[in-house]
Amino acid sequence: MTLTASSSSRAVTNSPVVVALDYHNRDDALSFVDKIDPRDCRLKVGKEMFTLFGPQFVRELQQRGFDIFLDLKFHDIPNTAAHAVAAAADLGVWMVNVHASGGARMMTAAREALVPFGKDAPLLIAVTVLTSMEASDLADLGVTLSPADYAERLAALTQKCGLDGVVCSAQEAVRFKQVFGQEFKLVTPGIRPQGSDAGDQRRIMTPEQALAAGVDYMVIGRPVTQSVDPAQTLKAINASLQRSA
């Protein structure tokens, strides 16, 4: 299934599912992608794949009709972060992220860099606390707050800077929706369908639990990419989410 590269031709999906592509081999990744339907999910490209295969790989996914979450977690001086975010927008991605711990000036510069793109600008999301982090990990960094409290502090700063939302754990989603409102988007990794292995994520939920918690976009990796029938797995997840809505 191959569509043209223009953003207007990309398949529209109402699914909250974002499939994390974690492949060492480009052909393996594209082989997987060709088995699934862009109406059933969006795709996340992270640091490893982007470093290996570059912007052209993102374009190949877009040509197949998929919206792309470019998960590079920019964290740099304000000017550099702003230019990086603008480059992602030039690439036509659907979503891009920065680290909230980069501070207010960095996040504000990143947001301002997207103003010239108008309605074609990607969603700009900030990372709060990585889902693999526990209280002991934060303590090692000199942070005495709990992961939940630290994530909320960073989320408040993110909203103050005018970004579209945050990456957070599903456990934080209920409170974040109450505190920051329905328009503030919540993107959550560590989502595993019932019966899946937890992998390296520590704070996990099922898709149905995440939806009930207020998560807007849920990132799912190996339960889909390692499925014998990924297309059917996606359809089953989406059907379950529709029943839960």
Curated annotation (Swiss-Prot):
Record carries keyword Lyase: yes
Gene Ontology biological process: 'de novo' pyrimidine nucleobase biosynthetic process; 'de novo' UMP biosynthetic process
Active site per UniProt: 73
Annotated residues for binding of substrate: 22, 44, 71-80, 131, 192, 201, 221-222
Keywords attached to this entry: Decarboxylase, Lyase, Pyrimidine biosynthesis
Catalysed reactions, as listed in the record: orotidine 5'-phosphate + H(+) = UMP + CO2
Pathway assignment: Pyrimidine metabolism; UMP biosynthesis via de novo pathway; UMP from orotate: step 2/2
InterPro entries in the cross-refs: Aldolase_TIM (IPR013785), OMPdecase (IPR014732), OMPdecase_AS (IPR018089), OMPdecase_bac (IPR047596), OMPdeCOase_dom (IPR001754), RibuloseP-bd_barrel (IPR011060)
GO molecular function, a single term: orotidine-5'-phosphate decarboxylase activity
Family designation: Belongs to the OMP decarboxylase family. Type 1 subfamily.
Function: Catalyzes the decarboxylation of orotidine 5'-monophosphate (OMP) to uridine 5'-monophosphate (UMP).
Protein name: Orotidine 5'-phosphate decarboxylase
Species per Swiss-Prot/TrEMBL record: Escherichia coli O139:H28 (strain E24377A / ETEC)
Encoding gene per record: pyrF
